[in-house]
Amino acid sequence: MTGRDGLSDARSRSRALAPGCPPTGSRLRSFAINDLLGLEADLPTPAEPGLRSNSGDPAEAIGSGPGPGPGLCGSCPARGALPLGLGLLCGFGAQPPSAAAAARARCLLLADLRLLPSAGPEPAVAQGPVHPPPALGSQQRSESVSTSDGDSPSEEKNDPKMSLILGKRKKRRHRTVFTAHQLEELEKAFGEAHYPDVYAREMLAAKTELPEDRIQVWFQNRRAKWRKREKRWGGSSVMAEYGLYGAMVRHCIPLPDSVLNSADSLQGSCAPWLLGMHKKSTGMRKPESEDKLAGLWEFDHLKKGANKDEDGPERGPDETTQNPENSLEDVAIDLSSSSRQETKKMPPGSSTQLPQPPQVGAS
């Protein structure tokens, strides 16, 4: 049962108790909301003594009746223009009027006027703008703040920059799986040089069919593994030489004298692998350099001999007679390869029987 039903029941009881009110069993004239709720009152007759008193204040009408019946019953016809709670005042008709009853009726009337709106024209106070209580306003502000905070993650997700950053974080490169042949070639190259140059990396890439950047990363990881193992074994001096060697390879710095001086005693050196790599590199470079130097020396001497052959007829007779040793050297240089072989086959004592070059100036 709601509050309106309770008020309607109380109103019906008050009508039954009041002598001037219409009976409760009367039939409703229409199905309007006022008739269903009992808000519409019967029209007053001029014979009723409380008609004039209803024109004034309802509270005055309640206390102005001569007796309990007419004074209180006069308020029943005025219920159509007053709020719903005024029907309860009819229950006081059986009691004699007193100051306490009048004050109580006035309080009930004022409470009904404040809480329940009337069916007639609204008062001027209700026509003004209705402001919500501060508690509701603060609650609405807190809800708006919470909704804005709750929408912020969705805005960040919708932001293209944030989505790109999340995509970059989630993107991971797959690990490269090396075959046995590739690992064998890489380990062999690592045994030769821990810091391969660009040419060595390109050769490894051609052999193993791996990209050069993957080879470089493999060497970085392999050096880190080697350093970890050397630290575990306590090779601090080896680590120092290793770091120095890496700096030298990067900046093309020659080996220090301490390492070069310990090349004779390989077993007592602090970095035997470094000396081994140094000897291997020098051993690979030395034959090539010697062959190049020998070829250049022969080419230069042959060129000088050809120039001397061209300048031979112009020289005077005194040059060969004054310097016989120089003349023999010139002749030996100017001879062809066949004449050289013949001179090698001749005994050492017959070197003085070499043919003399013709003296052009003597004739």
UniProtKB/Swiss-Prot annotation:
Disulfide bonds: none annotated. Residues 1-12, 300-318 have a biased composition (Basic and acidic residues). Residues 171-230 bind DNA. Disruption phenotype: At embryonic day 14.5 ocular morphology is normal as is expression and localization of retinal transcription and cell cycle regulatory proteins. It is found in: Nucleus. Keywords: Developmental protein, DNA-binding, Homeobox, Nucleus, Sensory transduction, Transcription, Transcription regulation, Vision. Transmembrane segments: none annotated. GO terms for molecular function: DNA-binding transcription factor activity, RNA polymerase II-specific; sequence-specific double-stranded DNA binding. Expressed in the postnatal retina (at protein level). In the adult, expressed exclusively in the cells of the neural retina with expression restricted to postnatal cone bipolar interneurons. Residues 231-283 form the CVC domain. It holds the Pfam family Homeodomain. A motif (Octapeptide motif) lies at residues 31-38. A motif (Nuclear localization signal) lies at residues 168-173. Binds to the 37-bp core of the locus control region (LCR) of the red/green visual pigment gene cluster. May regulate the activity of the LCR and the cone opsin genes at earlier stages of development. Dispensable in early retinal development. This is Visual system homeobox 1. The lineage of its organism: Eukaryota, Metazoa, Chordata, Craniata, Vertebrata.
